[in-house]
Amino acid sequence: MLSLAHFLVLGAILFAISIVGIFLNRKNVIVLLMAIELMLLAVNINFVAFSHYLGDLAGQVFVFFILTVAAAESAIGLAILVVLFRNLDTINVDDMDTLKG
């Protein structure tokens, strides 16, 4: 039987991997978006673990809202990325330093 500590350790490991992914790869926007989504999933695992441990469904309902917002964020982020790639021919973060109208 898995205890609360197992889920919290899993969430902490996933969160740490996402932080490392953000700090080690600052060039590719797609990898940055994936690391942010992994960070959100780590937080969701903690919400579900505490919700199950305390016997309250509020944490699980909150996870559904977070997943909905994360899906919308991913769709909008990828749409912006496609437009930037069409205009700049790159997805490198260092090349996206100009603000043109």
From Swiss-Prot:
Keywords linked to the UniProt accession: Cell inner membrane, Cell membrane, Membrane, NAD, Quinone, Translocase, Transmembrane, Transmembrane helix, Transport, Ubiquinone
Listed InterPro entries: NADH_UbQ_OxRdtase_chain4L/K (IPR001133), NUOK/Mnh_C1-like (IPR039428)
Compartment annotation: Cell inner membrane
Catalytic activity entry: a quinone + NADH + 5 H(+)(in) = a quinol + NAD(+) + 4 H(+)(out)
Entry protein name: NADH-quinone oxidoreductase subunit K
GO terms, biological process: ATP synthesis coupled electron transport
Gene Ontology molecular functions: NADH:ubiquinone reductase (non-electrogenic) activity; quinone binding
Transmembrane stretches, start-end: 4-24, 30-50, 61-81
Stated family: Belongs to the complex I subunit 4L family.
One GO cellular component term: NADH dehydrogenase complex
Function, in words: NDH-1 shuttles electrons from NADH, via FMN and iron-sulfur (Fe-S) centers, to quinones in the respiratory chain. The immediate electron acceptor for the enzyme in this species is believed to be ubiquinone. Couples the redox reaction to proton translocation (for every two electrons transferred, four hydrogen ions are translocated across the cytoplasmic membrane), and thus conserves the redox energy in a proton gradient.
Broad enzyme group: translocase
Species this protein is from: Cupriavidus necator (strain ATCC 17699 / DSM 428 / KCTC 22496 / NCIMB 10442 / H16 / Stanier 337)
